[in-house]
């Protein structure tokens, strides 16, 4: 199973693709879509749609795992994030990719062992578990962690045990409702 993890944002959108083969989870690719902030917000949303479409076309995921909304202190930032997430969900749905959503605290608890973990801790664990040559950018590390959380039910505990990292509780996906 090829899972595309997505950490949505209106300035930077992280993505990471993992594949499960039997009990093994392997890194395929990851990256960050840096959105041009010089234009209108609507132009940013178009760029998210276009660039994510290229990632989906290049990697043909079987499923997607997207970070769910969380409460932000700034209402305007929360609204912009909500719009960006909407574009992500629409692009995935139009591509026929099944979508699951995970709250940030669950992802952090699954990957690091506690829901209030720092981004650097998530990147450190993902670098070790996936045997990456260098730590990914924070948005990409989060996206890889979201994909790993999705794959956790059938193999993540074994991958963590092999890496020497603490074994977290299993996570259950929450299917996105589109309509």
UniProtKB/Swiss-Prot annotation:
GO terms for cellular component: cytoplasm; Holliday junction resolvase complex. SUPFAM superfamilies: Ribonuclease H-like. It is an enzyme of class 3 (hydrolase). One of its GO terms (biological process) is DNA recombination. InterPro entries: RNaseH-like_sf, RNaseH_sf, X-over_junc_endoDNase_Mg_BS, X-over_junc_endoDNase_RuvC. Binds 2 Mg(2+) ion per subunit. Keywords: Cytoplasm, DNA damage, DNA recombination, DNA repair, DNA-binding, Endonuclease, Hydrolase, Magnesium, Metal-binding, Nuclease. It catalyses: Endonucleolytic cleavage at a junction such as a reciprocal single-stranded crossover between two homologous DNA duplexes (Holliday junction). Mg(2+) 2 binds at residue 67. Mg(2+) 1 binds at residues 7, 139. One of its GO terms (molecular function) is DNA binding. Its main location: cytoplasm. Its cofactor is Mg(2+). PANTHER family: CROSSOVER JUNCTION ENDODEOXYRIBONUCLEASE RUVC. Belongs to the RuvC family. Homodimer which binds Holliday junction (HJ) DNA. The HJ becomes 2-fold symmetrical on binding to RuvC with unstacked arms; it has a different conformation from HJ DNA in complex with RuvA. In the full resolvosome a probable DNA-RuvA(4)-RuvB(12)-RuvC(2) complex forms which resolves the HJ. The RuvA-RuvB-RuvC complex processes Holliday junction (HJ) DNA during genetic recombination and DNA repair. Endonuclease that resolves HJ intermediates. Cleaves cruciform DNA by making single-stranded nicks across the HJ at symmetrical positions within the homologous arms, yielding a 5'-phosphate and a 3'-hydroxyl group; requires a central core of homology in the junction. The consensus cleavage sequence is 5'-(A/T)TT(C/G)-3'. Cleavage occurs on the 3'-side of the TT dinucleotide at the point of strand exchange. This is Crossover junction endodeoxyribonuclease RuvC. The gene is ruvC.
């Amino acid at each position: 199973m090829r899972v595309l993890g997505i950490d949505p944002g209106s300035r930077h959108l992280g993505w990471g693709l993992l594949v499960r083969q039997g009990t093994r989870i392997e890194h395929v690719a990851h990256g960050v879509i840096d959105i041009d902030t010089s234009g209108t917000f609507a132009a940013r949303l178009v760029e998210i749609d276009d660039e994510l479409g290229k990632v989906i076309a290049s990697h043909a995921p079987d499923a997607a795992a997207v970070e769910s909304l969380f409460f932000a202190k700034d209402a305007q930032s929360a609204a912009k994030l909500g719009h960006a997430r909407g574009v992500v969900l629409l692009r995935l749905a139009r591509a026929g990719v099944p979508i699951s959503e995970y709250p940030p605290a669950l992802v952090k608890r699954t990957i690091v062992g506690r829901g209030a973990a720092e981004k650097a801790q998530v990147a450190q664990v993902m670098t070790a578990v996936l045997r990456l040559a260098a730590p990914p950018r924070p948005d990409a590390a989060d996206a890889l962690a979201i994909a790993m959380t999705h794959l956790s039910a059938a193999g993540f505990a074994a991958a963590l045990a092999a890496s020497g990292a603490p074994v977290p509780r299993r996570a259950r996906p929450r299917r996105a409702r589109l309509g």
